[in-house]
Regions:
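Divalent metal-coordination and catalytic microenvironments
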Residues: 8, 23, 28, 49, ...
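Divalent metal-binding pocket/active-site signature
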Residues: 183-242
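Divalent-metal coordination cores built from histidine and acidic residues
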Residues: 69-184, 213-214, 288
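Active-site neighborhoods of metal-dependent hydrolases
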Residues: 133, 138-157, 161-164, 173-191, ...
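N-terminal metal-binding scaffold of metallo-dependent hydrolase/deaminase domains
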Residues: 1-39, 48, 452, 462, ...
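Active-site mouth loops of central-metabolism enzymes
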Residues: 59-70, 155-168, 194-196, 232-237
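C-terminal cap of metal-dependent C-N hydrolases
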Residues: 317-326, 404-411, 416-417, 422, ...
């Protein structure tokens, strides 16, 4: 079927100035782009006064875990309403792929963030995963192979250096994924078991990416001035030390290093922004290709254990409860909180588990007062109640000023880093993260509109080498987002709904039209994207 979209303001994904023109869709491809195309189509849409761009791409996603749900649409719907057609998933070291199905540690996969509950199965290789999801999900998906998943497959959550045999097995798993079309690899240095990897292990993962000329995305070991990642609470910022590790593994190499979610946890960390950007610039001078991404929120979502030191997480429950270990932890947490400008008042419970709904939406400090215990004891109670798998919303991670500065940085890409939860408080980024970037541009706090559109389309497609996506080009897949700039400018953010997005085409199929979803079509519109 041929569809003609006429008289729209066209943003082509390159960062060039927009122009009034038409786009002809033939089947799942863009057939023509230009002014005043002939009305030789089965369906014609007059988009006068509207804007049209390539379908948005979420550059940092975890929706590989939701593409295999038995009913995936509810997990993709809010993103579709933001105009997002494609996801780069498998981030933070925690991917659905990259393990051996007969691994004795298969129950460890998911890193405490995700599970295989209500899914169609487990798929250890990329080939198996793509065979299961291609044309069987709402949106397009490319996948990174996660280091945490591969490490867990060979050694579980063991807090130790891998044996030579284990390391060889882990690297073989990741290399196989790259050969089968993974978009790259990901490290999650703040999550088990990735946090147990030393610099040499990280370097070997990076070398694989160099070998296949694919990106390495990294959730760094620390994202704050002080943390539980390093023993010294004074001196160099932990956030900067964590980046020093990345310098060690990539300096003087052509690695495509992508720093995930540039955030600064705690008010004392905000001043590290300038030096972090300087370090990135210095690393680029050695030949390393460094980029980073952001979401348009000042808070973030994480596992409840994210503030616990590795030595404590590696203990048994009985060891964790020993008085000496509790005292040691308490002293460390108190000192960290004072130095960081971040405390239990800033940690809000999103989900603990059945029977604990009364805690959702409350800070740990508030819960401690209600339960008549110390903040730390309340926090550890919540950790144990959730089997150390609870979910929290934390902030501040950033400021509007920092976000605005990053929006003007040529190396910055956009993403949501959000997913739909079955229970508890949702991450606000699932609703309107991308409309807020567009709104920033229209209100003058963000980059220009052409560059803003590029950061969520062509630039991401380029970074992850997504074939025939991200641009308004003849022969490319017809992923197209239609938006209303007046509605975006006047939109009210943070209301648990999107705004300003009019239509979304995925592979030539109109899946969102004036707020109405084409639910039947969305069962099969999504494609698996292999990167060669």
């Amino acid at each position: 079927m041929k569809q003609l979209l006429k008289n729209a303001k066209l943003y082509d994904g390159t960062g060039a100035e927009p122009f009034i023109g038409d786009v002809l869709i033939d089947g799942d491809r863009i057939a023509k782009v230009g002014p005043a195309l002939a009305d030789e189509a089965d369906v014609v849409y007059d988009l006068s006064g509207k804007s049209l761009s390539p379908g948005f791409i979420d550059g940092h996603s975890h929706n590989d875990w939701f593409a295999i749900k038995k009913e995936p649409l509810p997990y993709f719907e809010p993103f579709i309403r933001q105009g997002i057609a494609t996801f780069v998933a498998g981030n933070c070291g925690v991917s659905t792929i990259g393990f051996e199905p007969d691994s004795p540690h298969a129950d460890k996969l998911g890193g405490g963030l995700f599970t295989y509950q209500d899914t169609t199965g487990r798929y250890g290789t990329l080939d198996e995963f793509f065979a299961a999801v291609d044309r069987n999900m709402p949106c397009n998906l490319s996948v990174l192979a996660g280091h945490c998943s591969a490490r867990a497959a060979v050694s579980g959550f063991a807090n130790r250096k891998l044996t030579p045999e284990e390391e060889t097995g882990m690297l073989a798993i990741m290399e196989k994924a790259l050969q089968q079309g993974a978009a790259g690899l990901s490290l999650g240095m703040m999550y088990e078991p990735g946090l147990y990897a030393d610099v040499e292990e990280q370097r070997k993962v990076a070398e694989l990416c160099v070998k296949y000329n694919k990106p390495l995305t990294v959730h760094p070991r620390a994202e704050s001035k002080v943390s539980m990642a390093y023993p010294q609470l004074f001196g160099r910022s932990h956030l900067l030390r964590a980046f020093d590790e990345l310098v060690e593994i990539s300096k003087n190499t052509p690695l495509k290093l992508h720093y995930s979610h540039a955030i600064f946890v705690g008010r004392s960390s905000f001043k590290d922004k300038a030096e972090l950007l300087c370090l990135m610039d210095e690393l680029r001078k050695t030949g390393t290709d460094v980029t980073f991404d952001i979401y348009n929120e000042c808070l973030g979502v994480s596992v409840i254990t994210v503030i616990l030191p590795g030595w404590y997480q590696g203990m048994s429950v009985e060891e964790k409860r020993k008085p000496f270990n509790r005292l040691k932890l308490a002293a460390l947490v108190k000192a960290t909180s004072l130095l960081l400008g971040f405390g239990f008042k800033d940690i809000v419970v999103a989900y603990i588990g059945p029977g604990y709904e009364r805690f959702e939406g409350k800070s740990v400090h508030q819960i401690a007062k209600e339960e008549g215990m110390s903040d730390l004891n309340a926090y550890l109670m919540l950790c144990e109640a959730s089997d150390f798998k609870g979910r929290v919303n934390m902030g501040p991670y950033s400021t509007k000023e920092i976000i605005s500065d990053f929006e003007h940085d040529e190396h910055c890409l956009y993403m949501t880093d959000a997913w739909v939860e079955d229970h508890g408080v949702q991450n606000p980024a699932i609703y309107d993260c991308y409309p807020k970037f567009l709104r920033d541009s229209l209100l003058g706090t963000g980059d220009t509109m052409p560059n803003t559109v590029r950061r969520m389309t062509g630039a991401i497609a380029d970074r992850f080498m997504l074939p025939e996506r991200g641009y308004l080009k003849e022969g490319y897949f017809a992923d197209l987002t239609v938006f209303d700039e007046n509605m975006l400018r006047a939109g009210v953010p943070d209301r648990e709904e999107s705004f300003g997005i009019e239509k979304l085409f995925i592979n030539g199929t109109l899946v969102l039209d004036g707020g109405k979803l084409n639910e039947q079509a969305l069962k099969t519109t999504g494609r698996a994207i292999r990167v060669k």
